[in-house]
Amino acid sequence: MLKFPPLKPHKPIGNVFVYSQKNSFGSIVYKMANKDGKYVGLMETLPTIVNNKRQSYSPNATSYPSLLIQKLSVGPKRQGFGSAFINIAKKDSFKHFCNGNIHLVASDMYDGLHPPQVFYRKLGFQFNKSSGFTERKVDEFIAGKIPESGLYGLGDTYMFFENNVDKDGKMVEFMKRFKEKFPEIFEWL
């Protein structure tokens, strides 16, 4: 559980264009361009059912719907593009009956000096139960107790944003009936 709320509300990013397309594997690929038409980021998501018997993600359920973020890449960093993609994923999670649940594997393979675990933690993501060491390090960095160099080598970390695990599946069934009755609302999302 988070010991602190997300640090600050994210201001909306103006003048960006986001294009989405479903690929042949069922994933939804989002591409973002700035006002000049320059490519600034990509996110790939897939609605899934998490079979969580080992509780790699949420400790609250063994099987639940969740949106998997397979890939999130932005450049330049620290401009708000990653946060915009996460906000899109949160909305998309409801649109695809995942009840606001998101999960991913944060990896420092591409940028060991600036690990993504800090970014996801600031946005409200939680660590799984076996990532206690990584969780402590990231929380200490966010609190200003250790320098960023102390985060080097965190590796791969299972992280999740849990809204509603819907253990009995009633919420998913309700949302499917709701979508059939009011499809224009889901087109608007």
What label would you give each PLM region?
Residues 1-79, 83-189:
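Non-catalytic substrate-recognition and accessory regions of acyl/acetyltransferase enzymes
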